[in-house]
Regions:
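Bacterial N-terminal signal peptides that target proteins for export
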Residues: 2-12
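Structural preference for beta-rich elements and adjacent junctions enriched in aromatics
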Residues: 23-262
Length: 262
């Protein structure tokens, strides 16, 4: 019986490890500075592997020409680099105010947890849920306003974003993003929506072996009042039927390890 129990324990540990590895990603260090221009013509991108964006988190499953996507991720000491290739037959941005109902417009969503510690981040900066809009502005939810209302903030200092459609059919969207990584000490005033002038937050330096929490997703809307599809890089386990949990908790992020195999 003890041998059987030990064997069962070993199998369970192995299954857990395999399960965790299914959600683990590695990002290769870029040997050059990547220019964010939507062209993706740096040789460095050839060192990174494509990863799918194919897990339905909200809405019904879109057809391949309605939405399909994949991404690559790299890094250097100053930032993460993302190359996202998207098939989207209709690009839609219905709200002029970048902070108003931004999740119902087409946007790229970058989830990032600097120390991979997990936990709630819905109304704080324990982790970030950057919604990068078609106008290349980045929005997240900050601490609540004094009156208790939600506080949607622009974090454009964190993100550099450029996209363009390919001239070749089927005219995919080529979206390049660089992300300066901030830890959970990041703060900003509740009302002004501007970085604290007394102590301007600084991004962390990245290094080989560092682990971050990470997930990528896309909000797709072809002209409806609300988004029609929400597709991510991770198949999140539903809680009470809800998979749209990334903006609430970093516990659902995958683990991204920065490596340098040169």
């Amino acid at each position: 019986m003890p041998k059987y129990a030990d064997y069962l324990k070993f199998i369970m540990t192995l299954l857990m490890a395999v399960s965790m590895n299914c959600f683990a990603l590695e990002a290769q260090k870029s040997p050059e500075k990547i220019r964010i221009d939507g062209l993706a013509n740096e040789v460095s991108w050839q060192l990174a592997k494509w990863q799918p964006i194919n897990s339905l988190l909200l809405g019904d499953k879109p057809s391949a020409d309605d939405f399909s996507g994949q991404f690559k991720v790299m890094w250097d000491e100053q930032q993460l680099y993302l190359l996202v290739e998207i098939t989207d037959d209709v690009l839609f941005d219905q709200h002029a105010d970048p902070r108003h109902l931004y999740w119902d417009d087409d946007c790229l969503e970058i989830f990032l947890d600097e120390d991979a510690s997990g936990g709630n981040h819905q109304f704080n900066f324990n982790a970030f849920a950057y919604h990068v809009a078609l106008d290349n502005q980045a929005v997240d939810i900050g601490e609540k306003n004094v009156d208790g209302s939600d506080n949607f903030v622009l974090l454009n200092d964190h993100i550099t974003s450029v996209w363009r459609r390919s001239e070749k059919s089927p005219n995919k969207v080529i979206w390049e993003v660089s992300v300066r990584v901030y830890d959970d000490n990041f703060t900003m005033p509740v009302k002004q929506g501007m970085p604290n002038q007394n102590k301007v937050p600084q991004p962390v330096n990245l290094f080989s072996g560092k682990k971050l929490g990470f997930m990528l997703a896309y909000c797709d809307n072809d002209g409806s009042k609300e988004r029609e599809h929400f597709i991510g890089s991770i198949d999140i386990k539903a809680v009470k039927g809800n998979k749209n949990l990334g903006y609430i908790t970093a516990d659902v992020f995958s683990q991204l390890t920065l490596i340098d195999s040169r």
